[in-house]
Amino acid sequence: MKSFNHLIIHFRTYGLKHKFLYSASIMLFFWTIFDGIISYISPLVIISSGYSNTMMGIIIGTSSIAGALFDFLLSKYLQNSHWRRLYLIMFIVCLIQPLILWQSKVAVIYLLAMAMWGLYYDLLGFGNFDFVSREMETDEHASSFGVLGVFKSLGYLLAPLIVGLVIGEMLDWKPFVLALVFLSMSFIFFLILYINGKKRGIRIERLQQYRPKGFLVEINLWKKIGKVMLPFLIFTMLMSMQDSFFWTIGPILSETFVKFKPLDGLFLTAYSLPPLLVGWFIDKFKGTFGRKANYISFIISSLFLITFAIFRHPLILLFVILLSSTFSTFSWAIEQGLYADYIEDSFSKEKEIEGLVDFSVNAGYVVGPILAGFLSDKVGYFNTFAFLGIFSFFVTLILSRIAPKRVAIGG
């Protein structure tokens, strides 16, 4: 998770040497606005078809199940595919998915739309990885991924605000057309990348460094590493659940802020702002709270969420969301740093650690929407966030007590 300060440092270090990377970043920026619009309107579209919040949560949760399945299949069959092919397939799927979502009326078609959502997101991830590994020098990989991450965060920041301007009293064709406009803008930059990439020729020949160890061996490694890292993996799942709550029922709650129209998208914009800013303060925060900083910050974030049971005024809630998101972002950033340290200490287990982390994230994005939908049917949208805060508070408190001071995975 990189903030604006990373982009400034990267540009000072490399300047215009990375024009190709900046073109890819702009492509990703417009694509992320497209995806942010789809993320925002998906729960609204499903609810408008007469489905309950619980059913809506189940439908959205299937996108992460499909994503996990496609992640396995793509890693198995598209290991050496070029980023040009991966991005091109992604754009084709992205073009079809909103059209299916727009015309969906029955659950089966919604499930198909969610599966395509999971597919194109995985294609983007594989495309980004291949792009950086082929086009950037090895010692520039981490910084290059950081630049892509900044533009991605910026897109998700603006998407709710932009789509909120075109959603009226009824959800019609306008948000879908708007999403496709930004997808088209992204595709233009892809064409520029495609043409310039052909001219550049082969920059870096990718080597297959990872050899699968066999299914049973992998399962045993997952069990061994997962047992040691269990508190951290549960914590990652919890953070993913919180994020999915905001993107599942946040758009619906935003539409209840009548006084804010047409700026009701500010709800998720306030939630998406901190990831772009906390980079300047993360080291100081860690220095203040020490090795438990990730848990302490999430406990504070959860306490702010509990106040949803009390406050109803949109301006107060925006401030609460901003503060809660700020502290949860600290937790995300610190947790990612911990995983990076574990990988550095046990480099031969890199793929297994990454696989377990991805599994925890996917699990959070499956359980989160289902739980968010169910609770909002039972206790309402505001109390759902309050319940999330209470649940997160106690789980994080327990994890902070049982988490080991040091994780020894072995070489």
Segments (PLM) and residue ranges:
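Helix-to-loop junctions at the C-terminal end of transmembrane segments
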Residues: 70-82, 167, 278-290, 376
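Structural signature of the two symmetry-related core transmembrane helices
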Residues: 85-99, 180, 292-307
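Symmetry-related core transmembrane helices of the 12-TM Major Facilitator Superfamily/SLC fold
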Residues: 175-192, 385-400
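Central cavity-lining transmembrane alpha-helices of secondary-active solute carriers
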Residues: 58-74, 269-281
